[in-house]
Design a protein with these regions (language model features):
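Short beta-strand-to-turn element immediately C-terminal to the catalytic PLP-Schiff-base lysine
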Residues: 115-118, 248-252, 332-333
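N-terminal small/polar loop signature for handling phosphorylated ligands or for N-terminal nucleophile
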Residues: 34, 44-110, 191-250
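Phosphate-binding and adjacent anionic-ligand microenvironments
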Residues: 236, 276-413
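Proline/glycine-rich low-complexity loops and linkers
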Residues: 77, 130-157, 252-324, 331-332
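Gly/Ser/Thr-enriched, mixed-charge loops and adjacent short helices
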Residues: 1-2, 19, 111-232
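An N-terminal, well-structured beta->alpha segment
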Residues: 1-69, 145-175
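Gly/Ser/Thr-rich active-site loops/lids in small-molecule metabolic enzymes
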Residues: 124, 201-203, 255-274, 341-350
């Protein structure tokens, strides 16, 4: 019996010892290939993979299936960050999209298929529903010829050109970089070294598929980075998740900086140092800190449901400056309508260079101006049917008080 495949907020995820099998990957990529050949016949599709075991093998399978549908499938020649693959598709006029095989920020044993459209955005709900509805029950055994390419050099030049290289070089900074064994290893560290930054890279030359670390840039998984920053006397620790579309950070005192604070700093850099304007798009779960700062900087805030695909859809309308989710994904519209953890790290370095202040001082200044905020998150793992039941029940849950205080509002977005 074939598995029922449902896409989540950012692609299809399953355990390698469960539903993430050769047959199911072939089924998903067959549906993608048929869709794109119908809407974009003969166009280019980039296929990438990260450092997880078997990611490369599944990417080779996917590229062959995509090519069998008459599309120009391009398989990357080495592990790449998802933002690099997305950028390659977005800036290739002949490309209709990209497909990434990655463990992303998920624990050991998981792999995902992330789908990106030709403009770099996450696939919208209409595309997802068509894929799910037209997916074959069994793989068709299709395999075509694909080509390979190294997309990294062009991507590295592009993100480096986005920041003020002279300011960063003049600052003579020291940072710790933690790619968490993921796809950014070597790339972010090398970029910063080329910009004159002294870098201590940890969790490099490793895989994210290990039991002692989850490649999610939050506590407790950033503990090693926190220690390294203090021991090295660095001005910051820069952390990316398994496929480098999310960012985490540590200040010079070894304190974890939550994603809302990072987005606030990035927003400040874009407005105050680049004189850029536009709407700021955030998920419902994003902190009020970002909203306060955006309004103070004269930017209108747009709130969307959880899932970056909703933010990307708003970015594609135009007039958006930046979009961010509470999990550390930050997308800058002038770059592409998708998250890029590597670019976000470079912008933090640029901000520290221009202000002459380490990360902790910048956060202290934020809190002095806009108040101190706290944020906590607890994930709950549910089976698909249980999650659907919860979605049905939640609209009827409207608490009159929480910890003795009345909620200002309740949203079921």
């Amino acid at each position: 019996m074939c598995a029922i495949i449902h896409f989540g907020t950012d692609g299809w995820r399953a355990r390698v010892d469960g539903d993430f099998t050769i047959n199911n990957v072939a089924r998903v990529t067959d549906a993608i290939g048929r869709l794109w050949q119908k809407t974009n016949p003969g166009k280019t599709v980039y296929v990438g993979f990260d450092t997880r075991p078997q990611a490369c093998e599944f990417a080779e399978l996917a590229a062959g299936v995509i090519a069998a549908h008459g599309l120009d499938a391009v398989l990357v020649s080495r592990p790449v960050p998802t933002p690099a693959l997305t950028w390659a598709a977005a800036y290739d006029g002949e490309a209709c999209g990209a497909l990434m095989v990655t463990g992303s920020h998920h624990p050991q044993g998981y792999l995902c298929l992330k789908l990106r459209m030709g403009d770099g955005s996450t696939a919208n709900q209409d595309v997802i529903e068509e894929l799910e509805e037209t997916m074959a029950a069994e793989p068709l055994g299709l395999e075509g010829q694909y080509r390979t390419a190294d997309i990294i050099p062009d991507y590295m030049r592009a993100v480096a050109s986005f920041v003020d290289a002279d300011a960063i070089r003049a600052a003579h900074m020291r940072v710790v970089v933690d790619p968490m064994g993921g796809a950014a290893q070597g790339y972010l560290a090398d970029l910063l070294r080329e910009l004159g930054v002294e870098v201590h890279e940890i969790h490099a030359d490793e895989t994210t598929d290990r039991g002692d670390i989850c490649p999610d840039p939050v506590e407790p998984w950033v503990d090693a980075c926190e220690r390294a920053v203090v021991e090295d006397g660095a001005c910051a620790g820069l952390v990316t998740d398994g496929d480098a579309d999310r960012i985490g950070a540590v200040d010079e005192r070894g304190r974890y900086i939550h994603p809302h604070q990072i987005m606030a700093l990035v927003l400040g850099d874009l407005v105050q140092y680049r004189n850029l304007k536009g709407r700021v798009v955030v998920n419902l779960s994003c902190s009020t800190l970002v909203r306060r700062i955006a309004e103070a900087l004269g930017c209108r805030v747009v709130i969307k449901p959880v899932g970056f695909k909703y933010i990307a859809a708003e970015m594609k309308k135009g007039g958006v400056l930046v979009g961010g989710e509470e999990a550390g994904g930050i997308g800058i519209a002038a770059h592409m309508p998708e998250r890029d953890g590597i670019l976000a790290c470079l912008i933090l370095c640029e901000l520290m260079a221009k202000t002459g202040a380490p990360l902790g001082v910048l956060i202290d200044q934020l809190e002095a101006s806009f108040g101190k905020t706290s944020y906590g998150r607890r994930d709950l793992r549910l089976e698909a049917e249980d999650a659907e039941t919860l979605r049905t029940l939640l609209p009827g849950v409207n608490p009159k008080s929480i910890c003795g205080k009345a909620p200002q509002s309740v949203s079921h977005m």
